[in-house]
Amino acid sequence: MGREIITLQAGQCGNQVGSQFWQQLCLEHGICPDGTLEDFATEGLDRKDVFFYQSDDTRYIPRAILLDLEPRVVNNILSDTYGSLYNPENIFVATDGGGAGNNWAHGYAHAEKIFEDIVDMIDREAEGSDSLEGFSLLHSIAGGTGSGLGSYLLERLNDRFPKKIVQTYSVFPNNRSVSDVVVQPYNSLLTLKRLTLNADAVVVLDNAALAHIAADRLHIQNPTFHQQNQLVSTVMSASTTTLRYPGYMNNDLVSIIASLIPTPRCHFLSTSYTPFTSQQVEDARTIRKTTVLDVMRRLLQPKNRMVSVNPGKQSCFISILNIIQGEADPNDVHKSLLRIRERKLATFIPWGPASIQVALSKKSPYIKTNHRVSGLMLANHTSIASLFKRTLDQYDRLRKRNAFLDQYRKESIFENSLDEFDNSREVVADLIREYEACEQPEYLSM
């Protein structure tokens, strides 16, 4: 019974994160870098078919499509240890190789030109699935390819596969510091419109929080992108464990989304993970004690969140799903939930159930860890709106000066007017208002 997920990796960030993700999945499922099964790995304990298919020579191949408008990152992946893992027919690098120049409009326009090639790959993967559940897009929203090509993909996937789930792992820029991409607020706003209108669930990760976690939890002061990507791939693999080691609940994407997203517009999720160790991130320090209560309490601590938000007085959780991996006794889980409720460690919306949902999941038998229990929290929290507000404020400052708009006017979508900017701004402003409305007791009757 397959519920397959096709992964689309767009741009530099998407492909670098994706590359780490596939390495992590191979380790967890006992798959060698060339796709063959390790001698010690056994069939039947896990569901590899959600993310991999088997070729005629029984090698495991990721259901992944690698897309970029410049060749450097994809070439690095293909010349690396895991380079022969991927299906070469599922790799698209633009022939002119010039990239999108950190410009959303260029990435979007380029995607239109090459879409026939990309859609062939997507259709072939979809037809090779027994019962495709949906798509997962990995990208960043600040540059040109991940944002522009990513946006175009989201729109077309909705048109072409209206009944399939579209979920993303979207890396937001560190918008509290000066960026080397001056047009980042434009790119972010235009992408946010598509993430709001064309995705069913968006897992938000931001570079500011990732750098902070690396410094604070792992004692790595200036983390490399490679180390930050290891954090992201750990979260991605943990968020898919219930699909790959299925239990009674949360064993497909639709059930995870249904438990986290009660109203369709508020579908931006944040994550926390504990404990990070040197097994996931090179040179990280370890935490000694991991009881179920300890893990569940740490997951609720703001400093472990992978999104840098500014919670207001009324900020609250809409929903929480904790995925606990390892040796977890259901009685311990029950006691931990009672303790968290007694101590009021989590504030929920006034109009819905104030409960933390918990999924217990197996750990990979092939990876030895020095902690008994690890946990991932997927949370829908109203403070995520503060991240969108920052993007909006930065956009407004640039737009007021009409800065750098000529680069966008060169592309057909902005040739005759800048309406697309105004329209995107309105969609994001509505999204912020929706999250603020969620904090009110009368939300459902508004």
Swiss-Prot record:
This protein's GO CC annotations: cytoplasm; equatorial microtubule organizing center; gamma-tubulin ring complex; gamma-tubulin small complex; half bridge of mitotic spindle pole body; inner plaque of mitotic spindle pole body; interphase microtubule organizing center; mating projection tip
InterPro entries: Gamma_tubulin, Tub_FtsZ_C, Tubulin, Tubulin/FtsZ-like_C, Tubulin/FtsZ_2-layer-sand-dom, Tubulin/FtsZ_GTPase_sf, Tubulin_C, Tubulin_CS
Keywords for the protein's UniProt record, in alphabetical order: Cytoplasm, Cytoskeleton, GTP-binding, Microtubule, Nucleotide-binding
Organism, scientific name: Schizosaccharomyces japonicus
Positions with a binding annotation for GTP: A142, G143, G144, T145, G146, S147, G148
Primary localisation category: cytoplasm
CDD domains in UniProt: gamma_tubulin
Entry's localization field: Cytoplasm, Cytoskeleton, Microtubule organizing center, Spindle pole body
Family: Belongs to the tubulin family.
Name this polypeptide is given: Tubulin gamma chain
PANTHER family (alphabetical): TUBULIN (PTHR11588)
Functional description taken from the UniProt entry: Tubulin is the major constituent of microtubules. The gamma chain is found at microtubule organizing centers (MTOC) such as the spindle poles or the centrosome, suggesting that it is involved in the minus-end nucleation of microtubule assembly.
GO BP terms in the entry: cytoplasmic microtubule organization; microtubule nucleation; mitotic cytokinesis, division site positioning; mitotic spindle midzone assembly
Molecular function terms from GO: GTP binding
